[in-house]
Amino acid sequence: MTNDRLFAGIARVLSVRPLAAALALLLTLPLIGVQAQSLRPSSGLRLPTPAASAGAAAGSASGQRQADFIVAVVNSEPITNSEVRTKLVRTEQQIIQQGSPLPPRRELVPQVLERLISDKAQLQLARSAGMRVDDNAVEAAVQTVARQNQISVDELRRRLKADGIAYSQFESDLRDELLVSRLRQREVDLRVTVTEQDIDQFLREQEGGTELSSLALNLAQILVAVPENATPGQVAALQAKAQQVMDKARGGADFAALANEFSDSPTRGTGGLMGLREADRYPPLFVESTKSLKVGGLAGPIRSGAGFHILKVIEKRQAGMPGSVITQTHARHILLRLSPKQGETAATEKLAALRKRILAGQADFAALARENSEDASAKQGGDLGWANPGMFVPEFEKVMNGLAPNQISDPLVSRFGVHLIQVLERREAQMSQRDQREMARNVLRGKKQEEAYVLWAQEVRGRAYVEYRESPQ
């Protein structure tokens, strides 16, 4: 279960060309969800403020004031220059962390503005449809951000303040992301269907092919970031740290747990997973390092402009074609369904209390699942058995994939209700023909969802009234 592009198998990806990389990234930036709100421990939050961005450009208080002018109006709501600057710097940071070269700002800025316009139009549509995200869902998202960065909520507040970011604005941004993500689920994802004929045709089309252009990879990474202007001594120390992490991975340590503990990449909260992509849409450095590896193989540390990367091959197959070896997950969950008598806030609070009892050793997960879960798995203590990739809805699977064995998630909301998830173990397994067809179904569903989303987003954007404003002289 994953959401906004939360379908791990078909995530939008970076091209090897700088501008194409930026455009592909822009398609995922606004709704990447709370897992992308990552902090880099060495430097605090990597989320620049409008004032900081403007100050870097103008270097004066007057420059900061100038950054507040309106650059566009979307159905009467303004987009300011400071918003564009903030989104621009975030985009550039993520491009760098992905190991791709930066395009010129003169090419990137117009695309950032257009993305902000599209996001604004979608947010307005969600609000006009009466969709809401309650305070408890936002607080759960904040806790997820803190947990993924291995800090407390109080420490998160401190880092936000140190970087000049108002906590209220941070919460507002999370609320907007959750709201538009739910709109996409309702308007796009749930309306996509895949027929048996679609699967048959897909499998026929994907048979054969050995060229790099037909190869698909699903990689996970751990990034040990190297700051700009680092001294040779600092670089050597960070390289040694990366090598130590690599040694742990080769020694059998869980890669997702290592990513959560050591990685400076935004993917740390999801176990380092970067999603299934055509090989030529990964950075060439990553492809060269992993193309000869088998599933489960490790590469690194590899040096890029962002730092030192450690890579693991999660899946490897012909593009779009289910592979023969997959990573299965054994998990269990507690589900509380939403109803007039049990709203999202109440369900989330109840599951948070159950999680606290389990972590304190006061209760057993399976016993609580039998007593409280409203899923068919309750009788089995919430046990979901061994699951192949794509078996659960995206918003569920995204969180599950980011958990290390025995780790328990925070309460998360899916289209079925509110869940508490615990991953028990993982293994690599050979897929049956039935499993391959199911995998093909999920790949097709993801592709169709992406195609449908692009068309839907264009329609929403096309219906919006947009007025561009000239910058003050």
Curated annotation (Swiss-Prot):
- Organism superkingdom: Bacteria
Q: Where in the cell is it found?
A: Periplasm
The secretion signal range is: 1-36
A Gene Ontology biological process noted in the UniProt record is: Gram-negative-bacterium-type cell outer membrane assembly
HAMAP family named among the record's database cross-references = Chaperone_SurA
Q: What does this protein do?
A: Chaperone involved in the correct folding and assembly of outer membrane proteins. Recognizes specific patterns of aromatic residues and the orientation of their side chains, which are found more frequently in integral outer membrane proteins. May act in both early periplasmic and late outer membrane-associated steps of protein maturation.
- What's the protein here called? Chaperone SurA
